[in-house]
């Protein structure tokens, strides 16, 4: 149920006034037709996004949500970020409020020629436009994993929809005012709920509005003792991408080596921090302190330094895939990592070798939870746009369908293929070409071991409801001989050297640090 929060009462009533109503006529049928026009306006944005996927016919339903856009990082085209503030909106104007079923919303795409990668559509109805809206599920995504009692949001959404339906089924002009009251009450209830479930971290309404002061940011970010960049000695830059930059530092107080990640100061930063706090570090990177940069424009996250580097570095270093047993070990450990975060009702949404980092003991940990989502165990999470790296994105994400932990298992199938062969199964020179390859199932023809191939095929099932899950993955013949209880603590097959496991840059990073 979408909750309209931008002068919702005034705009709703003004919109209602523009629809001819027979106030002095008892003709209920005509009145119901008028009411149905108003209902169409509010229900248009929550219309189902379900799309069918098959090898013969691919249907792509463009969502009217303003969040469905892709931002391609110029320096790293395989890092994509959801762009909620795009200025390239494509406005579709309908001259009649009742004409919300635009036939252009359904496009056949045996190729992706009809897809606008920067699609940021907002359906503007004549005299009924300029609504600022979000759904409870979108709000969950926005505030992310600080929402401890996220199910309350879904209950609130269901209550609003049920009460609205009761009003829709009434007869009489008072329904307009009743409907306005529902939207007003829903906004108030949502605000109270968000403040309650985020009282220990952040008032989400302030975060969404971007109105937090520097002092409020520092209060939200406080994790342990108060720190500043002056407490660390910079060593080198060890990572850079669409998320920001990661540098190696030495903590002057403890003389411990740390990694500090620098990201934009927005609610996605708080989402990632809250996620990492919740996960605790057994299967994910540990965080110790969070604080603002000296210029107050960036968020700095002090994390454990994982000396082994990421799998992407080592794949690039060897130029081909890993030895079979090492690829199997890393795949198995990633399965355990996914088990852990999924039990916490979190979907990573960006599983790839770059985010699989090897710790000092030679075992895999996950990092970069900037795209992570909370999900409801009883129903899939809404799709807020194409998030992740093109080569690892699942079909349901590309088709703007609801998401579940199955999106991580699709990415695991891509990663497994890459760990074995050194390349990904779906390729292209641009993100669009990669997406077309994924949807058309055009894969690289590379011979691999029989059991490995069978598992990859099951992981890359285009239907998320039949895609193989954790239990069946662990029981697959490919993992015969793997002890799932001890693999994360046993002696690894190979342990990287303690140094030279990163593509480092000292001078360039110094300039960046000085700009903080």
UniProtKB/Swiss-Prot annotation:
InterPro entries: Kinase-like_dom_sf, Prot_kinase_dom, Protein_kinase_ATP_BS, Ser/Thr_kinase_AS, Ser_Thr_kinase_AGC. It holds the Pfam family Pkinase. It is an enzyme of class 2 (transferase). Keywords: ATP-binding, Kinase, Nucleotide-binding, Serine/threonine-protein kinase, Transferase. Gene3D superfamilies: Phosphorylase Kinase, domain 1, Transferase(Phosphotransferase) domain 1. The active site is at 350 (proton acceptor). Residues 232-479 form the Protein kinase domain. Coiled coil: none annotated. GO terms for molecular function: ATP binding; protein serine kinase activity; protein serine/threonine kinase activity. Its EC number is 2.7.11.1. SUPFAM superfamilies: Protein kinase-like (PK-like) (SSF56112). It catalyses: L-seryl-[protein] + ATP = O-phospho-L-seryl-[protein] + ADP + H(+); L-threonyl-[protein] + ATP = O-phospho-L-threonyl-[protein] + ADP + H(+). Residues 69-115 are annotated as: Disordered. One of its GO terms (biological process) is intracellular signal transduction. Residues 79-115 have a biased composition (Low complexity). ATP binds at residues 238-246, 261. Belongs to the protein kinase superfamily. AGC Ser/Thr protein kinase family. This is Probable serine/threonine-protein kinase DDB_G0293276.
């Amino acid at each position: 149920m979408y909750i309209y929060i931008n002068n919702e009462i005034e705009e709703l009533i003004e919109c209602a006034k523009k629809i001819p109503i027979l106030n002095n006529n008892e003709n209920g049928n005509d009145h119901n037709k008028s009411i149905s026009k108003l209902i169409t306006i509010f229900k248009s944005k929550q219309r189902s996004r379900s799309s069918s996927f098959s090898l013969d016919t691919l249907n792509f339903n463009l969502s009217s949500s303003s969040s469905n856009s892709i931002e391609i990082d110029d320096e790293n085209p395989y890092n994509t970020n959801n762009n909620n503030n795009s200025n390239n909106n494509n406005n579709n104007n309908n001259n009649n409020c009742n004409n919300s079923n635009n036939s252009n919303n359904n496009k056949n795409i045996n190729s992706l020629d009809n897809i606008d990668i920067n699609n940021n559509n907002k359906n503007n109805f004549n005299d009924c436009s300029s609504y600022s809206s979000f759904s409870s599920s979108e709000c969950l995504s926005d505030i992310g994993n600080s929402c401890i009692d996220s199910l309350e949001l879904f209950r609130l959404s269901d209550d609003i929809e049920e009460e609205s339906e009761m009003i829709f089924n009434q007869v009489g002009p008072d329904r307009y005012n009743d409907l306005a009251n529902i939207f007003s009450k829903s906004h108030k209830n949502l605000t109270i709920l968000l403040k309650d479930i985020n009282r220990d971290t952040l008032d989400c309404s302030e975060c969404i509005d971007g109105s937090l002061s520097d002092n409020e940011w520092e209060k939200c970010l406080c994790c342990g003792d108060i720190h500043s960049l002056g407490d660390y000695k910079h060593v080198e830059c060890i990572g850079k991408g669409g998320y920001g930059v990661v540098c190696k530092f030495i903590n002057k107080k403890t003389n411990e080596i740390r990694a500090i990640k620098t990201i934009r100061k927005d609610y996605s930063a708080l989402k990632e921090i809250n996620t990492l706090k919740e996960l605790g570090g057994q299967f994910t990177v540990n965080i110790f302190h969070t604080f603002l940069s000296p210029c107050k424009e960036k968020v700095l996250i002090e994390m454990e330094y994982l000396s082994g580097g990421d799998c992407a570095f080592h794949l690039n270093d060897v130029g081909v895939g890993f030895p079979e047993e090492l690829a199997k070990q890393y795949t198995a450990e990633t399965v355990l990592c996914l088990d852990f975060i999924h039990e916490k009702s979190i979907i990573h949404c960006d599983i790839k070798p770059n985010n699989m980092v090897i710790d000092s003991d030679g075992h895999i940990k996950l990092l970069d939870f900037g795209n992570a989502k909370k999900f409801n165990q009883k129903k899939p999470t809404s799709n807020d746009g194409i998030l992740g790296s093109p080569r690892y994105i699942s079909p349901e994400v590309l088709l703007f369908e609801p998401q579940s932990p199955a999106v991580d298992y699709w990415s695991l199938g891509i990663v497994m293929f890459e760990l074995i062969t050194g390349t990904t199964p779906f390729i292209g020179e641009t993100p669009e070409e990669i997406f077309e390859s994924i949807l058309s199932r055009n894969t690289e023809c590379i011979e691999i071991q029989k059991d490995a191939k069978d598992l990859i095929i099951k992981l890359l099932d285009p239907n998320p409801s039949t895609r193989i899950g954790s239990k069946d993955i662990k029981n697959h013949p490919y993992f015969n001989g793997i002890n799932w209880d001890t693999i994360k603590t046993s002696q690894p097959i190979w342990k990287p050297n303690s140094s030279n496991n990163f593509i480092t840059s000292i001078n360039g990073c110094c300039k960046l640090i000085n700009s903080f």
